[in-house]
A protein has these predicted regions:
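The canonical Cys-X-X-Cys-His
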Residues: 47, 53-63, 105, 140, ...
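Detector for the c-type heme attachment site
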Residues: 59-65, 110-111, 125, 145-146, ...
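C-terminal capping alpha-helices of c-type cytochrome domains
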Residues: 16-26, 101-115, 128-154, 250-262, ...
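Extended, well-folded interaction surfaces typified by the phenylalanyl-tRNA synthetase beta subunit core
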Residues: 152-170
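Electrostatic cytochrome c docking/interface patches
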Residues: 27-52, 171-200
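Short extracytoplasmic
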Residues: 39-76
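N-terminal export/targeting leaders of redox proteins
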Residues: 1-42
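Electron-transfer interface patches adjacent to heme c in soluble/periplasmic c-type cytochromes
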Residues: 75-104, 127-135, 222-263, 274-287
């Protein structure tokens, strides 16, 4: 009888633990079906700039063709956690997001939650996009709706064992994800505050220019100090004064427009795509990004 009692206790404890795990990893969407914050129509002209600042085409454009606005997805993003494929976000109603409402895009960007209520993998940088304004989400959706439909779904993700159960992405979110809008600093000017938003939210610069731990979370002490390319083909540079302290704000803004560095070099690898996008922004936005980057605290480059 005693052994049976212990068995019952173990079973109950396991059931309680499983229920707790299920509860804490539950996907939580920020916006409900009738949320009034998403009622207003967006501006596609403004959305085009959000699209450029967010570097959306670099991941979601269909590989192997020149049109960056054919958003069929499928680019292979290799990492220590598997190979991930950005999805089709074209207006195709079957294979893309043509049937989405604005709230679906808002929940994807600001919560990392799909319309079917599942977690997105953090290869989609929603930990940065979560700082976006709702107005920018509305404008982005308005622009996306002007783009052509592209048939065909992206190939499936191939995650490693750590992320093979998508529900467990909820644990990752508990550690590394927080929906926290950018707070303007009243002691700084409008340009600096605009730059903070572009760098920290839309541009998601820290997602590449930082080092990560074994679970894929950014190490706070390396934020913007550079990090290994997860595809294993290089190293993203330190963009704090420790590495580019002798660059002027004009140097940074020029790089974002032309890809040229002060030492007469040029950016390479994935940064070429970034420059393609930042070159589309108004000059005041590039100046704002430069002003914010110039203010970053000095951090030593971590060892590879």
């Amino acid at each position: 009888m005693r052994a049976r009692g212990i068995s019952v206790i173990v079973v109950v404890a396991c059931a309680v633990a499983a229920a707790a795990v299920w509860a804490v990893t539950e996907p939580r969407a920020a916006f409900s079906k009738d949320d009034p914050a998403l009622d207003q129509e967006g501006d596609p002209a403004k959305g085009r700039l959000v699209f450029a600042a967010g570097d959306c085409a670099s991941c979601h454009a269909r590989p192997g063709q020149p049109d960056r606005l054919r958003l069929g997805g499928g680019l292979a993003l290799s990492s220590p956690f598997g190979t991930f494929r950005p999805p089709n976000i074209s207006t195709d109603r079957i294979d893309g997001i043509g049937s989405w409402q604005t709230r679906d895009l808002a929940n994807a960007l600001l919560s990392g939650v799909s319309p079917t209520g599942t977690h997105y993998y953090p290869s989609f940088p929603y930990s940065s996009y979560a700082k976006m304004t709702v107005a920018d989400v509305r404008d982005l959706m308005a622009f996306l709706r002007t783009l052509p439909a592209v048939a065909g779904k992206a190939p499936p993700h191939i995650p490693t064992l750590l992320f093979s159960i998508r529900r467990f992405v909820g644990f990752w979110k508990l550690l590394y994800f927080q929906r926290q809008p950018i707070i303007a600093d009243p002691g700084r000017g409008d340009s600096w505050n605009r730059g903070q938003y572009l760098v920290e939210a839309l541009g998601h610069c820290a997602e590449c220019h930082s080092s990560r731990n074994v679970f894929g979370g950014i190490k706070p002490k390396t934020r913007f100090a550079g990090g290994k390319d997860p595809e294993g083909v290089g190293y993203f540079p330190n963009i704090t004064p420790a590495r580019i302290g002798d660059w002027t704000a004009s140097d940074i803004a020029e790089l974002l427009k032309t890809g040229n560095t002060p030492s007469h070099g040029r950016v390479g690898s994935s940064m070429t795509d970034v420059v393609t996008n930042t070159a589309m922004l108004p000059q005041e936005d590039r100046d704002a990004i430069a002003a914010y980057i110039k203010s970053l605290p000095t951090r030593p480059t971590p060892q590879p």
